[in-house]
């Protein structure tokens, strides 16, 4: 990314301020999205912004070394007087970032939806393409997408409902498997593809909902029971390992270590009435060894707290990021849910204050190089999850997060869907609607 590339989109905006006299201000502009002082990857789509108070604005940029300096001028529509604010920096990092994101778009409801789908977004532009939409499966739910190591030549996703199952894509070819017809006859969610590509760990759970009649939380989602199952892609077989299939414990959110030698997951002691005792249910982070296609030994606790429930662990090198909430296993509906960073070498964990807000932070994933993070947050309005990116220095510190760039802020205001389960992908994923229709005989 260079200054010339950035300035071109802004020149047209500057024309509209002709004839306006600007007084200089030492203050920084109240813009949205808040890009002041963020770190962006080289080559990302141009940052577009507007005044948070609705005033007209124009802006220019100048690059000095690896810093972009934006100067914003603002005025009331029809006025001949305006303010030119002090320049603010945007830092450019040369740390590589995977060129695509994959995510699900869905209305933030409880039971119903109209349209949903899995989509990819090119980070160097604003281009978004459908991987598969639920129109290809008669309006059923499509979810739980996963790519092995961000490799778009292989992926999987679930289709819920009558005739549903798990769809596997490999080199552009699709096949359908119903996990409940093999092994222990259990469905699977929250997939985690082993680095070798041979195995997929799933949580197999009974998901329930309750609707509190007091307080501000609209819905509570919880597991009545949950276990870990292992699918062998090579043999189409599903196995269970007794220590991960205990009725006295609920295991969920599997994720592999980078070398595939162990599986991290979240575990809580079972309670008889989860709906009534949900505030007592707190998940701890556990780990179990994995060798030659099998789990080995008993799991051990990596981190736990009597006041925090752990969910969505993701590992990069010696660092593990998880979502922390007061209780439970579905933090997206918990306003207090924050991201925490755990040093696996020291066992010390801290809130990732650089990333967190007053609203819920939940799903997150590392880039393949471990220097970038994508996560979902409801910080803009408390209802819809949007995607934010942040740089990681490799020493335990994140930069200020920034909203995924769009052509205009109105895109975020008018798109009444939530971004769900973001994942970095190393190149453009396929588009499978036509093949999925054929697979389902539509």
Listing of model-derived features with the role each one plays in the protein:
Residues 7-16:
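Bacterial N-terminal signal peptides
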């Amino acid at each position: 990314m260079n200054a010339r590339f950035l300035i071109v989109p802004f020149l047209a905006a500057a024309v509209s301020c002709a004839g306006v006299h600007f007084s200089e201000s030492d203050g920084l502009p109240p813009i949205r999205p808040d890009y002041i002082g963020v770190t962006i990857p080289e080559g990302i789509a141009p940052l577009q912004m507007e005044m948070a108070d609705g005033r007209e604005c124009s802006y220019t940029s100048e690059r000095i070394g690896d810093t972009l300096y934006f100067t914003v001028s603002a005025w009331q529509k029809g006025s001949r007087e305006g303010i030119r604010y002090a320049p603010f920096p945007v830092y450019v990092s040369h740390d590589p970032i995977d060129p695509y994101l994959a995510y699900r778009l869905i209305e933030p409801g409880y039971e119903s939806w109209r349209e949903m789908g899995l989509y990819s977004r090119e980070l160097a532009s604003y281009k978004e393409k459908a991987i598969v939409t639920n129109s290809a499966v008669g309006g059923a739910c499509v979810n739980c997408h996963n790519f092995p190591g961000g490799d778009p030549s292989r992926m999987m996703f679930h289709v819920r409902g009558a005739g549903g199952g798990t769809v596997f894509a490999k080199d552009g070819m699709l096949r359908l498997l119903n996990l409940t017809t093999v092994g222990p006859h259990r469905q699977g969610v929250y997939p985690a593809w082993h680095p070798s590509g041979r195995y997929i760990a799933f949580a197999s759970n009974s998901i329930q909902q309750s609707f509190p009649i007091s307080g501000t939380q609209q819905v509570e989602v919880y597991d009545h029971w949950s276990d870990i199952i292992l699918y062998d892609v090579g043999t189409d077989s599903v196995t269970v390992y007794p220590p991960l299939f205990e009725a006295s414990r609920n295991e969920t959110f599997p994720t592999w270590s980078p070398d595939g030698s162990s599986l991290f997951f979240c575990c809580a002691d079972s309670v008889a009435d989860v709906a009534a005792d949900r505030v007592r249910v707190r998940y701890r982070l556990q780990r179990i060894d994995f060798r030659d296609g099998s789990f080995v030994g008993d799991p051990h606790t990596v981190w736990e707290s009597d006041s925090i429930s752990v969910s969505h662990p993701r590992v990069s090198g010696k660092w593990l990021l998880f979502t922390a909430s007061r209780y439970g296993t579905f933090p997206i509906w918990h306003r207090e849910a924050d991201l925490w960073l755990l040093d696996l070498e020291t066992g010390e964990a801290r809130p990732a204050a650089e990333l967190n807000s007053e609203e819920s932070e939940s799903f997150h994933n590392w880039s393949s190089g471990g220097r970038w993070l994508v996560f979902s947050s409801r910080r803009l309005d408390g209802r819809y999850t949007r995607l934010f990116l942040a740089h990681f220095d490799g020493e335990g510190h994140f930069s200020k997060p920034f909203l995924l760039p769009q052509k205009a802020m109105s895109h975020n205001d008018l798109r009444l869907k939530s971004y769900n389960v973001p994942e970095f992908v190393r190149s453009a994923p396929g588009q499978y609607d036509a093949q999925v229709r054929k697979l389902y005989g539509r």
